[in-house]
A protein has these predicted regions:
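Residue-level marker of positions within ordered structural domains that often coincide
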Residues: 3-6, 81, 142
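Low-complexity, Ser/Thr/Pro/Gly-enriched N-terminal "stalk/linker" regions
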Residues: 10-124, 151-173
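Bacterial Sec-dependent N-terminal signal peptides
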Residues: 1-13
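Mobile, glycine-rich extracellular loop/lid and propeptide segments
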Residues: 128-141, 156, 160
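Residue-level signature for tetratricopeptide repeat
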Residues: 83, 140, 144-147
Length: 174
């Protein structure tokens, strides 16, 4: 919604009522879901008996997760980029660069090539790497590069596209 408003008008929407709602949600997620090591939890409140039933292939994981999976964590990047783009408020740039991106780097798998983000922080072992998760992050890096002109963000987007293109196949259904 904020992106549409900003795109249509060509201006920031700092005073739009949805901005304060989005800002409040962002603050609450950062405050309620944060972990000591700069990540976010998968759920709030943390339930020690939680069963994760939405894993690939119908697998189920029992017990407490130490952090969120990549997909919900990367949504924080999308939100911060969108809020920065919509408002121009450097608060979102600071949150992104000081909290979200450092946490996101804990998912970076540089051991398996081409490098990309894996589905769970690397310090907890090897986990799945998914093209769809990485494409959303690559798009966010492209948007953020466009806003900041910082070459590191473009380089990260290109690295992610190298991973994504590595999965290309001309086989039907492949």
């Amino acid at each position: 919604m904020l992106f549409c408003l900003a795109s249509a008008s060509g201006k920031t929407v700092k005073n739009h009522p949805f901005v304060s709602i989005a800002d409040s949600i962002l603050d609450n997620v950062l405050n309620l879901y944060q972990t000591e090591d700069g990540l976010l939890t998968e759920t709030y409140p943390v339930n020690p008996d939680q069963k994760i039933t939405y894993l690939a292939g119908g697998a189920q994981q029992n017990g407490t997760l130490k952090a969120s999976f990549l997909w919900p964590y990367s949504g924080m990047m999308s939100g911060c980029v969108a809020m920065y783009q919509a408002t121009g408020d450097k608060k979102y740039k600071t949150i992104l660069e000081k909290r979200i991106l450092p946490g996101l780097e804990q998912y970076w798998d540089g051991e398996r090539l081409p490098a990309c983000y894996q589905s769970y922080p690397v310090k907890y072992g090897q986990h799945g790497r998914y093209y769809d998760d990485n494409i959303w992050i690559a798009l966010d890096y492209c948007d953020y590069y466009r806003l900041t002109k910082k070459a590191d963000y473009l380089k990260k987007a290109i690295a992610l596209y190298e991973y994504i293109y590595s999965g290309w196949s001309d086989e039907l259904g492949g």
